[in-house]
């Protein structure tokens, strides 16, 4: 089954949760996972999408208190110079005793007349990687050349997680990328476990079969309906969770949802992994 549980800010709808609700969610996930007493299970919780450095420190201390293993820190404030980003991570690192994961995605540029988003420089990531409590990075730029440079630069110091086209993307960059984000594994963790075991056994045909018949077809849903609404609606179809949303987010319109149901049925017919759950 699944071993690493990551409460991610966007997937977990942090933008429409209060800080107290985010802490409650972090705690519920952590205590639920830890209740199984499996030493191999890891919980990664997160701070709010937009907050002060002090709030990030408060969340890091709370994560430590509830027994989480790692806190994922995102930086969504406008950036005017790189030292601003470094100082944020350093301040949190200096004031907590929990592992820190860098949620690296394009930064919001505060300089007018410049590109609205900018990538983290390798020099900046190199400095942050040397901070005492920083142990991992979620590489979320979704640019192959950049991902390759970042993973090669940091793989000997940090656990590197890639995002976007999970298993297919991971195969491109292994051994410099240690793990990938699981989308299709949300329906059945065996998808990801079997893929990894096939990789270790050098059964590349099986790896490609899982990618071709599960991951890539599911990505057509993401591309058509959007990742966050698409995956939640698909999980509703498979009996995993409700597709209900909190406004201003709203669930897919009924016609779109019916089309998504048909697409999920087609994927299920191609793969033994996707079996609808029953209560």
PLM segments and residue spans:
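Active-site beta->alpha loop and helix N-cap motifs at the rims of alpha/beta catalytic domains
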Residues: 1-119, 248-250, 270-278
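Conserved, mostly hydrophobic/aromatic
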Residues: 29, 63, 92, 137, ...
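Catalytic alpha/beta core domains of metabolic enzymes, predominantly
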Residues: 102-215, 219-225
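C-terminal alpha-helical cap/extension of soluble enzyme domains
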Residues: 2, 176, 188-279
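General structural feature for long, well-ordered alpha-helical segments within catalytic domains
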Residues: 21, 25, 55, 59, ...
């Amino acid at each position: 089954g699944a071993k690493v549980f990551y409460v991610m800010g966007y997937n977990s709808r942090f933008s429409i949760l209060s800080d107290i609700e985010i802490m409650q969610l972090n705690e519920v996930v952590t205590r639920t996972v830890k209740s199984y007493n499996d030493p191999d299970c890891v919980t990664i919780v997160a701070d709010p999408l937009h907050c002060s450095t002090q709030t990030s420190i408060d969340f890091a201390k709370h994560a430590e208190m509830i027994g989480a293993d790692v806190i994922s820190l995102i930086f969504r404030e406008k950036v005017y110079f790189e030292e601003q980003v470094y100082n944020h991570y350093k301040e949190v690192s200096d004031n907590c005793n929990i592992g820190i994961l860098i949620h690296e995605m394009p930064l919001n540029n505060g300089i007018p007349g410049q590109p609205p988003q900018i990538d983290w420089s390798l020099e900046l990531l190199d400095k942050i990687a040397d901070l005492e409590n920083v142990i991992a990075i979620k590489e979320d730029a979704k640019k192959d050349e950049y991902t390759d440079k970042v993973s090669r630069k940091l793989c000997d110091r940090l656990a590197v997680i890639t995002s976007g086209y999970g298993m297919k993307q991971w195969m491109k960059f292994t051994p410099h990328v240690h793990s990938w984000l699981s989308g299709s594994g949300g329906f059945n963790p065996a998808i990801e476990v079997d893929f990894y075991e096939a990789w270790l056994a050098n059964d590349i045909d099986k790896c490609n079969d899982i990618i071709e018949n599960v991951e890539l077809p599911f990505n057509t849903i993401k591309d058509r309906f959007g990742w966050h609404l698409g995956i939640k609606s698909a999980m509703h179809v498979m009996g995993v969770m409700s597709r209900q949303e909190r406004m201003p987010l709203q669930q897919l319109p009924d016609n779109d949802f019916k089309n998504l149901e048909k697409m999920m049925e087609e994927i299920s017919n191609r793969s033994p992994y996707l079996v609808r759950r029953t209560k």
